[in-house]
């Protein structure tokens, strides 16, 4: 039987995909076996009427080894 643990992260990037990749990369520094990331919300940062970046809140799921 596998045990899955979930942590919540907030990550930023120039695109949503970039933000998520940054979040996975940072989470992978402290946890192994990341299997899934679930997005809770996305915020766009706006400056001078243009979107200049994204902030994403996501849950990162990973398998705990015995």
Where are these regions (language model features)?
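A cross-kingdom feature marking charged/low-complexity
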Residues: 38, 43-66
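Short, well-ordered alpha-helical segments
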Residues: 2-36
């Amino acid at each position: 039987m596998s045990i899955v643990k979930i942590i919540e992260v907030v990550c930023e990037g120039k695109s949503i995909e970039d933000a998520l990749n940054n979040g996975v990369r940072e989470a992978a520094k402290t946890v192994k076996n990341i299997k899934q990331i679930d997005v809770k919300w996305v915020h766009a940062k706006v400056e001078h009427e243009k979107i200049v970046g994204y902030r994403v809140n996501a849950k990162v799921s990973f398998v705990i080894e015995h």
